[in-house]
Amino acid sequence: MRVFGIVGSMRSNRHTATLVREVVEAMEDATSPLEAEIVHAAERTFAPCRVTCSPYCSSHPYRCATTDDVGTVLKRMIEADAVILGAPQYFRAPPAHFHAFIERVQSMFFFHETVGAARTPSPLAGIPCGLVAVAEYSNPHGILEYLHDFSTLVGMRPVLLDGFPYLGVGAHGDPREDEVFRPHERAKELGAALARAAAARREGRGA
């Protein structure tokens, strides 16, 4: 089984990265063997969308006219059995660099599926997705909703939790001190649930 995680923070060793790693570790405890890869947005090149999507994306399924790391990261997502998306909240939104990635991928999918002459099914369709959000001074639920909207728009299946905040792992400030969202506990729950969802999908596909 293969899991691919994306840390949307501009810092590679802080709370978002820690919680994404904890979800992966929980998956490792729940299933074996597990091949895991985590990439950091801060270490990748994601240019802003140039709005060439209507003429280009409509005729090039799920590809972008701009050549950078967006295509490589999308390919890793497509190849994975499960995806983890993690991001902090900056000013009412995730970091601009990570948002550029989200915007580019969403545009590829939207314009191919709505403008393209041929309809190629989403290559991300049905892939289980776990969500992680961190907010220092506000509620992380806004970022969870943001990630949930993106993942469903491209066809992935966000894995929900049985307890608050339901959409994924949320943390308010330092996760070690957060007794409301209980991020470390939720990370373990999400990893186990994500492993089950990925295994069920593989079994259904005869993998």
Description of each model-found segment:
Residues 1-110, 114-115, 177-207:
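N-terminal beta1-alpha1-beta2 submodule of the flavodoxin-like/Rossmannoid cofactor-binding fold
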Residues 168-175:
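A short acidic, helix-capping loop that chelates divalent metal ions and anchors anionic groups
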Residues 33-40, 156-166:
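Short beta-strand elements in bilobed, periplasmic/extracellular small-molecule ligand-binding domains
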